[in-house]
Amino acid sequence: MIAQPPIQFDRTTGVLQGANPWERLAAVALLAGSKVSSLFSHRGYNACANLLRKTLSEREIAVRLNDDAVFVFPYGDGYWSKLLNRSFKYEDELELLFQDSAGIDYTLLDCGANYGYWSVLVSSRPFGAHKAIAIEPSSVNYARLANNARANGGRFQAMHCAIGAARGTARLSGTKHEAFSIAGGAGAGGEVVPVIALDDLIDDGIVAEGGKYLVKLDVEGVEIEAIKGGTRLLRGDTVIMCEEHGSDPHHTVSRYILEQTPLKLIVYDPASDRFETLTELSLLDRIKVASHVGYNVFGTASAFWEDRFHRMNANAARRVH
């Protein structure tokens, strides 16, 4: 049986093409569900969308993110179908940094890339056409990541491995494609995957020591191990972007960055529309309002990137006045 071509959706115009009547009705439901559930941080949306997906034929959707970026995923996917809602912004605080950095010569290290959303976007012309290296441990996710690299002209590199403290292997476990993890240890079962450290990328000649890097660490519970494995990379002109879990009242990742590394800890505060440099963690108690959501925090030892955050704050102040 020949696979059907992907449904096409343009986030700029809202035009949906190539869908049959039932798929169009499903799109209406997915859009409405996103708008309603956005009022409570999309709680329950993924599960409801995945139930709806069971009624659909297996098919992909190609979402045009901008005039130079196409992101392909299974139609009805609970995690990514929020993109059908044109007002939805995925990890808005990361997009602010990437947009502001369009004119800077940096490389994105997209660790835990999933299907490659950020690599697709950052390598596109409106975001500066940057070099991106997308790193994903799951073989199932990696196949979709590689497909997105091909769909965008092969302009970013995809690597099939996990990020940890040192080179080796680990077992990848989990039931949700957006939450596979090597944190369970050798007894967790699941797929055996290669592991590399961030500094191995320097040793292997994949990245150069002394460049500018934005490092997204979406590594599901091994953020601290990943930071430990990137000592050389992180002491240069690098920013790490880590997920601070809403369900963690101790702010474990942020606490480690603040107390155990030379990095400055920075967080985006939606209330002030500013990136705040933290010397203690009480602000996170206010920002982390939903236990099922991840909140990105930033760490850097770079005066260059610190200045960029200050510039973004100045630009935000000008927008208000």
Predicted regions and their residues:
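A short helix->loop->beta-strand "cap" motif at the edges of active sites that frequently abuts
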Residues: 128-130, 236-238, 261-263
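S-adenosyl-L-methionine
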Residues: 1-139, 143-155, 203-210, 270-276, ...
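Conserved S-adenosyl-L-methionine
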Residues: 159-161, 262-273
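Short internal loop-to-helix segment that lines adenine-nucleotide cofactor pockets
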Residues: 86-109, 157-158, 167-171, 177-236, ...
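Active-site flanking residues adjacent to catalytic metal/cofactor-binding acidic residues
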Residues: 109, 135, 161, 215-217, ...
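Core alpha/beta nucleotide-donor-binding catalytic domains of modification enzymes
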Residues: 139-142, 146-177
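Short, glycine/acidic-enriched loop or turn micro-motifs at the edges of active sites
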Residues: 113-115, 139, 163-165, 219-221, ...
